[in-house]
């Protein structure tokens, strides 16, 4: 009985200042975070670490950067990436369950639910295809997938094609940038001509011009150097436009000649 009484007294004792300080320190360092319980030891690729080093060097007040700061930055950044990865999987798992649940309802109900829940269709669709790709991978590649740029994974997951090829791209990842990896994916899994995501080079260019125009409209001031660059760009655009118009006229003339011959 005495032992039980002692145990209860010890259990309800207030933590000592030293213990409170230790707990606070662990909380600040992230050791007590419930999100980290299922974590592996997340690490960045050497290329990513190099980019963070370059970041600190660019914004540092001194010539040499703190090695400890770089280590902490890389460690925390790796944890952020893993938290985001786990969140996407949780979203994807539940979105898939909702899709199964709504299969007995009229067509369009799933899209309507996505809009009601997320406000758009693209974000949850990305989560869903990410989850499905992850679930289909062997365990050895699941950890590798976390290292890939997120946007590149969304693109890879959404493309129709061989699962083996997708796994090969994940397996061969060597820290390429998002742009480099997207180029590989588009080369290995080109969009079909009937795919609505397919767009001509001209349409892509028009999209960039529209975005650039909107950005320029928001500018309240522009330097002399920037103004010169803009003028050069306009001249290049005029030259390209002239060449395109010339080619179009030649093509139209050829068509007219061919039509007259056929008559």
Curated annotation (Swiss-Prot):
Family recorded in the similarity comment: Belongs to the UPF0137 (pGP6-D) family.
Organism: Chlamydia trachomatis serovar D (strain ATCC VR-885 / DSM 19411 / UW-3/Cx)
Protein name as it appears in the record: Virulence plasmid protein pGP6-D-related protein
One Pfam family of this chain: UPF0137
UniProt superkingdom: Bacteria
């Amino acid at each position: 009985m005495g032992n039980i009484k002692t145990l209860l007294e010890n259990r309800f004792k207030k933590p000592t200042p030293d213990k409170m300080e230790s707990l606070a320190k662990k909380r600040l360092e992230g050791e007590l975070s419930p999100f980290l319980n299922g974590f592996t030891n997340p690490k960045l690729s050497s290329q990513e670490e190099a980019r963070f080093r370059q970041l600190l060097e660019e914004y540092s007040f001194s010539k040499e950067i703190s090695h400890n700061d770089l280590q902490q930055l890389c460690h925390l950044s790796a944890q952020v990436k893993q938290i985001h990865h786990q969140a996407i999987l949780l979203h994807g798992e539940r979105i898939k369950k909702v899709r199964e649940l709504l299969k007995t309802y009229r067509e369009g109900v799933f899209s309507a639910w996505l809009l009601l829940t997320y406000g758009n269709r693209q974000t949850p669709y990305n989560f869903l295809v990410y989850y499905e790709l992850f679930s289909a991978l062997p365990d050895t590649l699941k950890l590798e997938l976390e290292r890939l740029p997120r946007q590149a994974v969304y693109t890879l997951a959404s493309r129709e094609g061989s699962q083996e090829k997708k796994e090969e791209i994940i397996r061969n990842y060597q820290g390429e940038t998002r742009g480099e990896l997207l180029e590989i994916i588009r080369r290995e899994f080109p969009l079909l001509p009937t795919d609505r995501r397919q767009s001509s080079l001209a349409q892509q260019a028009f999209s960039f011009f529209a975005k650039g125009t909107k950005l320029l409209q928001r500018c309240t001031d522009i330097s002399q150097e920037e103004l010169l660059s803009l003028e050069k760009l306009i001249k290049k655009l005029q030259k390209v436009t002239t060449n395109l118009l010339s080619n179009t006229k030649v093509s139209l003339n050829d068509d007219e000649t061919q039509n007259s011959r056929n008559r």
